[in-house]
Amino acid sequence: MDSKDRQILALLERNARLSYGEIGKAVGLAGSSVHDRVRKLEKRGIVKGYRAEIDFTAAGLPITAIVSLALRPASPADIPAKVAEFELVESCYSVAGDNSYALVVRAPTTKALEELLDALRAKLEVVTRSTVVLSTPFQHRPMLRG
């Protein structure tokens, strides 16, 4: 990966809807060259997909919580697969420290969050620790510099 690839990645990270021509103008390449480079980045697994940025409050999921899971001896071995069955869980991270997993949860109400926590504890034999997000000063901050 060279500096042009890094510049292309930085632009895509900020706005994945840019055309190849627009990216090309910004990095000094023809649109067709940008297209070729992006396809190679996709094939190498560096660019894994393109996503819409969703306003979860407007979409009916105004409650965001970080839920930590501490395993017990009776906890199943395939926690991530089991967690994926819960539709309110957006992300699951395997973490080091006192807990084994951290989940990002989006819920329509605090009651729905409470029901999810009860279900996680019952079905996964885990201890949960929850933090409800009050506000999000920033998220999805571009990390690549081009």
Regions found by a protein language model. Give the residues of each.
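A compositional/biophysical signature of low hydrophobicity enriched in polar/charged and small residues
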Residues: 1-146
